[in-house]
Curated annotation (Swiss-Prot):
It is found in: Cytoplasm. Transmembrane segments: none annotated. Keywords: Activator, Cytoplasm, Repressor, RNA-binding, Translation regulation. InterPro entries: CsrA, CsrA_sf. GO terms for biological process: mRNA catabolic process; negative regulation of translational initiation; positive regulation of translational initiation; regulation of carbohydrate metabolic process. The keyword Repressor applies. Belongs to the CsrA/RsmA family. This is Translational regulator CsrA 3. GO terms for molecular function: mRNA 5'-UTR binding. Homodimer; the beta-strands of each monomer intercalate to form a hydrophobic core, while the alpha-helices form wings that extend away from the core. A key translational regulator that binds mRNA to regulate translation initiation and/or mRNA stability. Mediates global changes in gene expression, shifting from rapid growth to stress survival by linking envelope stress, the stringent response and the catabolite repression systems. Usually binds in the 5'-UTR; binding at or near the Shine-Dalgarno sequence prevents ribosome-binding, repressing translation, binding elsewhere in the 5'-UTR can activate translation and/or stabilize the mRNA. Its function is antagonized by small RNA(s). One of its GO terms (cellular component) is cytosol.
Amino acid sequence: MLILTRKVGESINIGDEITVTILGVQGLQVRLGINAPKNVSVHREEIYKRIQAELAPNQDPQ
């Protein structure tokens, strides 16, 4: 895992098309802004896990 330190207003680029910007920090909470192409799904982890759990019973075993 790559660990980076950023200040409010600074960004991290992922590849050529994704930018994550630190918008604010309050206590233990960090606000992120994410710019990504429309074909790239961006979800909070708990939402992503819920989506995967809902899809799992519908997938055919291979």
